Amino acid sequence: MKVSIEEMVQVGMHFGHQSRKWNPKMAPFIYTERNGIHIIDLIQTHAYLKQVSQFLTESSAAGKTILFVGTKKQASGLIAKVALQCNSPYVNQRWLGGMLTNWKTIQTSIKKLNEFDYQEKTGGFDLLSKQEAAQARKEKARLQKYLGGMKHMTTIPDVVVIVGQPDELNAVAECRRLGIRSVTILDTDCDPSLADLFVPANDDSVASIQLILTEFLRSILNGQQMFSEKQQRGKKTA
């Protein structure tokens, strides 16, 4: 792992929420309180980040699908950027109820979005009346907004990376219901009992989120490289 504790300090990863807004379950990961703000223990953060990074490498090396989720404004753009860099699906606008637990319905909507994409590329919209074309484009834009990051996903994911737990409790609940492993960045207002693996850290600072997600990306790409090499070896021996 390339991230150092010094880098964590530089991006303010140790700053939690106001002490009155804390979740007592995060007490083991809090170093102290300063001016009414909880300070996260970065020695633990570093250890947990290393553990999660190893897990993501192993998951990618096994060919598992990793879904990124983060709709809060500080995370939304970073979620899309990182997911696209490792060809992973993502949700960064709004979690629609049943995105995982009602997967068949979501699959139908994704299929419709892909059909709209094909129609638009092949001039299919030009064959419609102005009103029909306008309606089709409006529906395509709506589907693209909420499902665009999942349009190449064919099955429910094996792992879900979540940024902003308090805002993504529906996603958390669906993961728990289906037994999908979740990886979460936990600020001092979060609940560690709802995450399978986690990194205690500031989830409100763009710089903090970016540093963690960049490490996640590095780990996933390493795993994907291992998976690709394993497949190539399999072809040679076949």
Swiss-Prot record:
It is found in: Plastid, Chloroplast. Pfam families: Ribosomal_S2. One of its GO terms (cellular component) is mitochondrial small ribosomal subunit. Keywords: Chloroplast, Plastid, Ribonucleoprotein, Ribosomal protein. Disulfide bonds: none annotated. GO terms for biological process: translation. SUPFAM superfamilies: Ribosomal protein S2. It comes from the Eukaryota. One of its GO terms (molecular function) is structural constituent of ribosome. InterPro entries: Ribosomal_uS2 (IPR001865), Ribosomal_uS2_bac/mit/plastid (IPR005706), Ribosomal_uS2_flav_dom_sf (IPR023591). Belongs to the universal ribosomal protein uS2 family. HAMAP family: Ribosomal_uS2_B (MF_00291_B). This is Small ribosomal subunit protein uS2c. It comes from Oltmannsiellopsis viridis (Marine flagellate).
